[in-house]
Amino acid sequence: MSASPVVGTREIAYRVFAAEFDDASLSYSESDEERAPNYVVTPTGARLNRTFVAGVLTEVEHVNDEVLRGRIADPTGAFVTYAGQYQPEPMAFLEGATAPAFVSLAGKARTYEPDDADVVYSSVRPESVNTVDADVRDRWIVSAAEATLRRIAVFDEALSMPYRGDDLTRALEARGVDPTLAAGVPRAIDHYGTTRTYLDALREVAIQALELVAGDRDQVDPLDVAPGDGGDGGDAVLGPLPELDLEPAESVDIEVGEADADEGDELGEPEADAGEAEAEPDDFEAESDEETADEPEPELLDSAESEADSEPESEPVAETESEPEPEPEPEPVA
């Protein structure tokens, strides 16, 4: 599938809400090479190697003597991040931080599945953590909501198209969808069976987040629908979504591969805007300038992993949270 856009030598840090990131259970690498980038694909098709978050640091705790776990809440839930010896600056920041505090986090998206549990945890391996203010947090909420609504619109469009798999990727790209999203949507359809019922529930979460920033509500309702809920979603009607500037579906004429098109599935035309894929703004200062390939995951996380599995973790501030485990990986972790 298409290569991801990069900024210099680094992949773009995309923005997703914690509620959707918490639902992510698909990760993959496009090659077997040791340092090949790893991607987490969310239920709306966001394909994340790196992600950028701004929210409230609600808790910092020791997983063991060498690993810290932090929780950063947005209006929809909480992101979990683990810092150890291979992340000295984020670890030092978390050690000295006093919760609650507004912070930004840039890092690698990861998933982890314990051997003895039928559950997948998502987390962010930190590249940088910085102090920000409420205005930065609010701007992040707006940008994450706008990116989420665009992805939902593209996904809805994709569900109405007669293609699946690589054929759908090519068809979406031919219509003008960003290559990264065009590669993620078919994988999300195949892995999650994401329905329009879920899309509309997530759409409502994004709208409520915008209303929260505008001062029209006090909190965002929890996302209590799973990606595959609602059957095939054929009867679900989505509320208002952004207009997509895409080529007409009838203008797309691609050669269908062996994996051919599924006729009965509804795919909608979602669009991946550059806005969604933009690198973090300067005032967020959330990344180190010369990050290239993924570093090996700290071995000390092996011990942290068993602890993280068994932790019930309560989130002090926001809602649902993705309870990620530190992963021992040969490459970057989630």
Where are each of the predicted segments found?
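OB/S1-fold single-stranded nucleic-acid-binding modules
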Residues: 1-40, 205-213, 223-232, 238-240
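Short, glycine/small-residue-enriched coil/turn segments at secondary-structure junctions
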Residues: 41-51
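OB-fold (S1/OB) nucleic-acid-binding surfaces
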Residues: 46, 62-87
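OB-fold and OB-like beta-barrel modules that bind single-stranded nucleic acids
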Residues: 49-59, 98-111, 124-129
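Short, conserved beta-turn/loop elements at beta-strand boundaries and strand-helix junctions
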Residues: 60-65, 114, 134
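Short alpha-helix capping/helix-loop boundary micro-motifs
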Residues: 88-93
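Extended, charge-rich, solvent-exposed interface segments
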Residues: 95-102, 115-218, 322
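Long, low-complexity intrinsically disordered regions
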Residues: 221-334
